[in-house]
Amino acid sequence: MTTLIISDLHLDPLRPVVTELFLRFLREQVSGADAIYILGDLFEVWIGDDMPSEVADRVAAALRTHADAGTPLYFMPGNRDFLVGADYAARAGFRILPDPCVVDLYGEPTVLLHGDLLCTDDIAYQAFRAQTRDPEFIAQFLTQTLSARLAFAQQARLASHAHQSGLKQEDDCTQFEKVTDVVPADVAAMFACYGVNRMIHGHTHRPALHTLQVAERTCTRVVLGDWYQQGSVLCVDADGLVLEQLLLPG
């Protein structure tokens, strides 16, 4: 049996081909899985569970089919969809996980996280994250009208794009690569904090398997891939794990 782990789909009405790939994945490759974990950024934007979205409706229905069939579904919010709440979770049939958290995968304790917590060189983003994850901010934000929330999300996205464009112009993208990737010291600190030998995260869109030494322990960090030019899924079973790519339709 296999556990399937994905992240960074960034589902958006403007990229319907990715939505179709994900729905096909759910139809054809999920039946019989031990569990499915979605580690954030399932959606490109989420401004509250009352947000009208045909894409979100189709995804919820497809996920619910597997939940009703007995497959455990888990969702960890990302930086794009951290406002996914209990109402949508109930519709889709998944359990919302804290970021980070430790799960047992076939006898191997594994720390799961979206991954943005490890990108501490991006000081501007970490400040924005701290502000927008504050419970008081969230409660106040969700009382605003849909149009006001959408305007805030659009402004935040434009600011993010401008920030990243500025980084790319410095030192031939060297600064961009550094700031948007994880900080090794933070990775080591998280391994030390949780006392596990395996970590799985997304966010950076740099799929790979990394091996490192932490306090004389050999640890593995698995980085999930995004769903832009292809799909990406991590398959984990009792024998190990493998990162697989899914081809876009057409």
Swiss-Prot record:
One GO cellular component, as annotated: cytoplasm
GO biological process: lipid A biosynthetic process
GO terms assigned for molecular function: manganese ion binding; UDP-2,3-diacylglucosamine hydrolase activity
Stored InterPro entries: Calcineurin-like_PHP_ApaH, LpxH-like, Metallo-depent_PP-like, UDP-diacylglucosamine_Hdrlase
Pathway participation: Glycolipid biosynthesis; lipid IV(A) biosynthesis; lipid IV(A) from (3R)-3-hydroxytetradecanoyl-[acyl-carrier-protein] and UDP-N-acetyl-alpha-D-glucosamine: step 4/6
Record Pfam families: Metallophos
Residue sites binding Mn(2+) 1 per the record: D8, H10, D41, H205
Its membrane topology: Peripheral membrane protein
Keywords, alphabetical: Cell inner membrane, Cell membrane, Hydrolase, Lipid A biosynthesis, Lipid biosynthesis, Lipid metabolism, Manganese, Membrane, Metal-binding
EC identifiers of the protein: 3.6.1.54
Gene3D superfamilies assigned: 3.60.21.10
Keyword set includes Membrane: yes
Binding-site residues for substrate, renumbered to this chain: N79, R80, D122, S160, D172, Q175, H203
Known cofactor(s): Mn(2+)
CDD domains in UniProt: MPP_YbbF-LpxH
Subcellular location: Cell inner membrane
Cofactor binding remark: Binds 2 Mn(2+) ions per subunit in a binuclear metal center.
Entry binding sites for Mn(2+) 2: D41, N79, H114, H203
Catalytic activity: UDP-2-N,3-O-bis[(3R)-3-hydroxytetradecanoyl]-alpha-D-glucosamine + H2O = 2-N,3-O-bis[(3R)-3-hydroxytetradecanoyl]-alpha-D-glucosaminyl 1-phosphate + UMP + 2 H(+)
Role this protein plays: Hydrolyzes the pyrophosphate bond of UDP-2,3-diacylglucosamine to yield 2,3-diacylglucosamine 1-phosphate (lipid X) and UMP by catalyzing the attack of water at the alpha-P atom. Involved in the biosynthesis of lipid A, a phosphorylated glycolipid that anchors the lipopolysaccharide to the outer membrane of the cell.
PANTHER family assigned to the protein according to its UniProt record, in alphabetical order: UDP-2,3-DIACYLGLUCOSAMINE HYDROLASE (PTHR34990:SF1), UDP-2,3-DIACYLGLUCOSAMINE HYDROLASE-RELATED (PTHR34990)
Family affiliation: Belongs to the LpxH family.
Alphabetized HAMAP family for the sequence: LpxH (MF_00575)
NCBIfam families assigned to the protein according to its UniProt record, in alphabetical order: lipid_A_lpxH, PRK05340.1
Protein name: UDP-2,3-diacylglucosamine hydrolase
Species annotation: Xylella fastidiosa (strain 9a5c)
Lineage summary: Bacteria, Pseudomonadati, Pseudomonadota, Gammaproteobacteria, Lysobacterales
Gene name linked to the record: lpxH
